[in-house]
Amino acid sequence: TSVVAAGMSYLIVPLLGDLNLTQDEAINALVIPGIGGLLLVFVAGVLGARFGERRTLGVAASTYFAGALLVAIAPDISLVTLGLLIVSCSGITLSIVSLSLLNSRISEPAQRATAFATLGVVAPAVFIAMPVLSGALTQFASWRWIPVLWAVLAVFVVLATIVFLRPVDRPSKRQEFVSPILAGLFLAAILQVLNNWPAGGLSSVRVWIPLAVACAAFVGFIYARNRVASPSLTLAPLRSRATTPLLIVAVLFPLANVFFYITMG
């Protein structure tokens, strides 16, 4: 996921010329995958718990591979957007299930600290290295080699999942998917409200429709949680003091790409 986020900036300018797009069309093609990722952000954790982390990681990495190849060979912006949507959704799943895997399989405090510290080193390293590599690629080759690089990395993830992760027998536990789906829909709708607000505020159809969807999703989420004894999505971690610095750190790295879009404007 960090690889895509770090290298995405270098797709915009080549896309404009290769597919004869306007700048707004290229930006929209990058916004839609983010919305799709938000829809799955809570469902991904439930998938790992329901089907097992090993199987979920393998399927997500394979789907990521297919999406990256679709971006690489896409002849028009609609297929590029579809490929980026697949990459975004499967990448979100990979990230969340990987964190869940670390948390469930490493119980020793010292080992867990080392594992999460290593994971914390990877993100800034990728955000430093990938823009340089992506920029170098676009200097002498087509932008389509960037998603090919994503596909190659997905192959390594599939192989690592098969080789290093052993299947774990767990008692089958029924998971409800309604509340995670509605929570993701709420986040995606709120993002659309914020994204379209400059177009005219509440007087704009592009604002009040997603706002209505967000309200309906929120009401449905509360109703779904109250209907089941053990909902799949819990808000308990948000009450922990340790959550705040983690959320701040998670936001800092993607903000690096904001400077690129500022220069585009």
Positions of predicted regions on the chain:
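Helix-loop-helix hairpins in multi-pass membrane proteins, especially solute transporters
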Residues: G34, V41-F177
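12-transmembrane solute porter fold
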Residues: T1-P33, G37-G45, R54-L57, A61-S62, ...
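Membrane-interfacial loop-to-transmembrane-helix junctions in polytopic alpha-helical membrane proteins
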Residues: T22-E25, L79, R112, P171, ...
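Hydrophobic transmembrane-helix bundles of small-molecule transporters
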Residues: A117, G135, Q139-A250
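Generic signal for short, ordered secondary-structure residues
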Residues: A5, A26-I27, T81, F116, ...
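A short alpha-helix capping/helix-coil boundary motif
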Residues: T22-E25, G48, R112-A115, G120, ...
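Short charge-dense sequence patches
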Residues: V13-L15, V31-G36, G52-R54, L85, ...
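Membrane-embedded alpha-helical segments in integral membrane proteins
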Residues: V4-P14, A66-D76, P124-Q139, I162, ...
